[in-house]
Swiss-Prot record:
Organism: Histophilus somni (strain 129Pt)
Signal peptide: 1-24
Protein name per its UniProtKB record: LPS-assembly protein LptD
Protein's gene: lptD
Keyword line: Cell outer membrane, Membrane, Signal
Record-level GO cellular component terms: cell outer membrane; transporter complex
Organism ancestry: Bacteria, Pseudomonadati, Pseudomonadota, Gammaproteobacteria, Pasteurellales
Pfam (any one): LptD_N
InterPro entries named among the record's database cross-references: LipoPS_assembly_LptD (IPR020889), LptD (IPR050218), LptD_C (IPR007543), OstA-like_N (IPR005653)
Function text: Together with LptE, is involved in the assembly of lipopolysaccharide (LPS) at the surface of the outer membrane.
Amino acid sequence: MKKNYYTVLSLSILTALYSTSSQANLQQQCLIGVPHFQGEIVQGDPNELPVYIEADHAKMNQSTHAQYEGNVNVKQGNRHLTAGMIEIEQHGKDNAKRYAYAKNGFDYKDNLIQLNGDNAKIHLDSKDANIQDADYQLVGRQGRGTADEVELREHYRVMKNATFTSCLPNSDAWSIEAKEMRQHIQEEYAEMWHARFKVSGIPIFYTPYLQLPIGDRRRSGLLIPKAGISTRHGYWYAQPFYWNIAPNFDATFTPKYMSHRGWQLNAETRYLTRIGEGKFVVEYLKTDRHSDSLNTARSRHLFYWGHNSHFLKDWRLNVNYTKVSDKHYFNDFESEYGNSTDGYVDQQASISYYQPNYNLSISAKQFQIFDKVDIGPYRALPQIDFNYYRNEIANGLVDFSLFSQVVRFDNDSALMPTAWRFHIEPSLTFPLSNRYGSLNIETKLYATRYLQKRGKGENAEEIKKTVNRVLPQIKLDFQTVLANRQSFIEGYTQTLEPKFQYLYRPYKDQSDIGLKQQNNDYLGFGYDSTLLQQDYFSLFRDRRYSGLDRIVSANQITLGGTTRFYDKNANERFNLSIGQIYYLKDSRTDNNPQNMAQGRSSSWSLESNWRINSKWNWRGSYQYDTHLNQTSLANTVLEYNSEKNNLIQLSYRYVNQSYIDQNLIGKNTYGQSIKQLGMTTAWELTDHWTLVGRYYQDLALKKPVEQYLGIQYNSCCWSIGVGARRYVTNRANQRNDEVLYDNSLSLTFELRGLSPSDHKNNIDEMLKKGKLPYIKAFSLY
């Protein structure tokens, strides 16, 4: 009954909140309610700007005093003062000072602020003014309030016994009262002393000093906090602090308290220099009191460094380095620098030199993986890559390329060998084409030399010290495009694009590269090779394995084709690709039957995209294993996009257990097929309400994998968001048949309107959350 009740309640809320006015832009609506400066802004020295005065009556007292009565208007540059009576006085002879005095009510306007109050003193030879008992509104942006005294200066405003809010008139959702307030105009921030924060007129907290942004400029200070409750974290509260160290250097520190785990400190530092930009991130928990994942209390931490630079015209430096304390880190802590479903994090750096015909790269690479294995992947340190390209040589008939690499492999395990690998790969391509099609004839040579060294462990396997491998390759690639304007669908043009490829590469036993006996605790072949994901596009790849340690023999024909449909505006609306490899001879790297291609043909592979209309898109992929006589892979996604970020996405993913197991190494098995059905939705229900929901169900386990519901209310001056999430997790010594969940509830509250650009609805941020974040997977738009 509870499930039905919540469903009906949710539908009721959706129906009640939905409005066609959601198409309007909230930011534009909010800015309609603020004053805007009329006319062109006048620049210049106030001493040199003329003063224009209009009034019903005027009384002159020599040349130092004048009194104007009745609908008095005083204009000077951008300033405009209106009142029932205004007096103009001039003081002094040399460097005389002129003042305008308004009493018993006035209105003042310039390009930055509008005020009305009781008394005003306007300095006509500068931008200064002194005002009593005023109501004010900022011009062109949200911000208003009251003050007993206001001092207007060229670069700042000082207000005594003042209030401030970004809410529009007739709304007092929140406000700040301060004994003294100083608004810095160019720096776009306000300082407040003895400040009281109120919600609907009710005092919430007091602080002796407060800084608040009133623009887009970066300022040091407290940012919006976040809070919530979780099964694993307990009650938690995160308070970010922003430090604007320099124009090109800033930092954000976020202490986070979790009642079940303790204090976590998160720090992010960004920098921008002449030779590059990047950031450092540290997440650190000294002692994790909640030890389900580790079975012991210990520190948990993350370090990230990302850097990109372009210097000395042709040089590039790139760093992408992430390291966590343990393999369960991303399962326990949500971070934008990794996800438990990725299975690994990168740790690599490279420096590269680019020229039109060649490039050189020196890099260091390794991965931190989260699989339950005792032996991790190899690190490549150093790795030197050189590429050379020269097209249209031999009178424009041939394209030449050369890839070469030198790399040293090392492993943390004493059981694993180390090695140097030297590789050179020249290729010649003969491109032939005419209006009927194109034929590319490519010849290539793989020449590799290994210098290997046995592992230092007592039980390390003996290994061949020197291995040489030379493999020639020839590939013929033919394709054509056949167009038919008389498609069976009226108004559409159909193309048929058949593709034929022949690939030949002789067999060479490569079992001496790396360990001869495959270690079940090591995921990979050789030093950096593993099976690549198979799909339609992989049918036309040269190699089945990543890296260079396993290059399979090939004597095969690949047949494939794509059909496309174009509308009358030449926009592609639908495509379908299908193909298969036919093996003329066994494809293998050694004599192990497990490392051979199964059967005389590969799986049938299909890929398709369909842009149904401007709002609906569909994508699907399918593989049928002719050896197992069953579906091995299937994916499909249907998405509805109405406007803005509004979307509904339905997805289904299937991976056959036999397909998984035949791609795993040694005695590792997955144990079941993957059958997963998912739904993601994000919707601006009205101008103010936003909803994001996500649900993934494992059909094999008959249990949900992840559930998420987030709803946010946005107004012109504040927003509040609530997110509820339930997802599958794990712990140390967990039984294979045991499914554990973490339940969490989060709350965010923000003050809006302080910056002209802070009216976003946070849909993108909510879609990124979770183990299975939203991915837009369409190629037709």
